[in-house]
Amino acid sequence: MNRTDVKIVQISLDLQSQREIESYNSLSQLGYKYIRIVNPIQKDYPPTHNVIDGNTHWIVGITKPDPNEWGLTAGHYGAWHGHVNAIYSSLVDTDYTLICECDCLLNVDVQSFKDYVDEAINLFETSDYKIIRFEVPNFQTTYDKQLTENIYSGDLMIMTHCYMINPKYRDFYINRVDNVGWHTPDWWLNFSFERAGEKMGVFKELKLTKQAAGVSSVDNTHRPERFTGIEGIEN
């Protein structure tokens, strides 16, 4: 029997793209309540007044001349804005919410994933953790302590294609949106939690989700199916 206190909020760009179709088909197997937010691709120069810490020099333009160049673009702002909308949408009720990007795929069987969702919710109900990351950790992730059989206290996660937020902490998330300027979604979450002195729950040893292959709207280049965006661990 499916839980009635869990929902998925998925951030969408192009409902007809192959990677979004694959993602929906994967996530819909879970049988949870489902909300899709269509987040139009940003085509204007990104705002400078609310970039994180006033670092306007990090903004390189509407797009990157070189996809491998570092810098913030309209695509990054649009991605951040999409996550903010998803967070707000998740907080309209008391459901535990999985926020998923448009290309998120399950990497384990459905029942196993549901069991890990239950493990995350049990931690939420017995602790003050505000987020559980269902993405694969990268080589920069550091761990503090083991919290459950599979979840560790950690930080510095790269990529944001699947995470669960705790509805008890609505005010925390609103405060972070109001007080931490925009960045890439993953680094915005990293900064938001670090500056509040908070750790994240991380599935340390498990590869629960991955990203489907396709053209990245942020980098405007084709990306293969992958678990993490950082080189240095097995993809």
How does the language model describe each region?
Residues M1-C100, C104-N235:
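An acidic/histidine-cluster motif and surrounding catalytic segment
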